Curated annotation (Swiss-Prot):
Record-level Gene Ontology MF annotations: carbohydrate derivative binding
Gene that encodes the chain: diaA
Similarity annotation: Belongs to the SIS family. DiaA subfamily.
Keywords from the named record: DNA replication
InterPro entries listed in its UniProt record: DiaA, GmhA/DiaA, SIS_dom, SIS_dom_sf, SIS_GmhA/DiaA_subfam
Pfam family name, one: SIS_2
Record note on quaternary structure: Homotetramer; dimer of dimers.
Coiled-coil intervals: none
Taxonomy, superkingdom: Bacteria
A GO BP entry: carbohydrate derivative metabolic process
SUPFAM superfamilies per UniProt: SIS domain (SSF53697)
Function: Required for the timely initiation of chromosomal replication via direct interactions with the DnaA initiator protein.
HAMAP family: SIS_DiaA
Name used for this protein in its record: DnaA initiator-associating protein DiaA
Length: 196
């Protein structure tokens, strides 16, 4: 058991090192995309399933409340949090449309969809991205593995942050770290603080 624990930590560290080498440009582009949307008076819609949904909620909560320092709230909506809306849509047997319907109702040109999917193949996330494209929204996608179907939907203005791993647990860990990086970059760009 102790050896298995060491393996988990070692894999996580190795994935972080690989991501630190591969992802800074994509994370920087994503942060600037989010910042520009907010500066233009737009909002960020976020979606994901399971642990990816928790990461989407964490991002939205960090925008609306704060990340590490006090600042005004920023407009972000996690589409996986309203149980009444979610169950109304799925009750009509529209499981794949659970986020797309919300994107079509709430999204506008200039808004950003933060789509989080470990493999990039979740039908409801793919449909949300397709809906965002029809609304002239920009997409920031957090993926893993080979990016899946989601990666193929992205245009030149969109940003994919693909975790260099084929282990779901490691991808989820790195998605959380990436969300924290994005929150930090957004805060420090919009509300730079002086170190005394």
């Amino acid at each position: 058991m102790l050896e298995r624990i060491k393996v988990c930590f070692t894999e996580s560290i190795q994935t972080q090192i690989a991501a630190a080498e591969a992802l800074p440009d994509a994370i920087s582009r994503a942060a600037m995309t989010l910042v520009q949307s907010l500066l233009n008076g737009n909002k960020i819609l976020c979606c994901g399933n399971g642990t990816s949904g928790a990461n989407a909620q964490h991002f939205a909560a960090s925008m609306i409340n704060r990340y590490e320092t006090e600042r005004p709230g920023l407009p972000a909506i996690a589409l996986n949090t309203d149980n009444v809306v979610l169950t109304a849509i799925t009750n009509d047997r529209l499981h794949d449309e659970v986020y797309a319907k919300q994107v079509r109702a709430l999204g506008h040109a200039g808004d950003v969809l933060l789509a989080i999917s470990t493999r990039g193949n979740s039908r409801d996330i793919v449909k949300a991205v397709e809906a965002a494209v029809t609304r002239d929204m920009t997409i920031v996608a957090l993926t893993g593995y080979d990016g899946g179907e989601l990666a193929g939907l992205l245009g030149p203005q969109d940003v994919e942050i693909r975790i260099p791993s084929h282990r779901s647990a490691r991808i989820h860990e790195m998605h959380m770290l990436t969300v924290n990086c994005l929150c930090d970059l957004i805060d420090n760009t919009l509300f730079p603080h002086q170190d005394d």
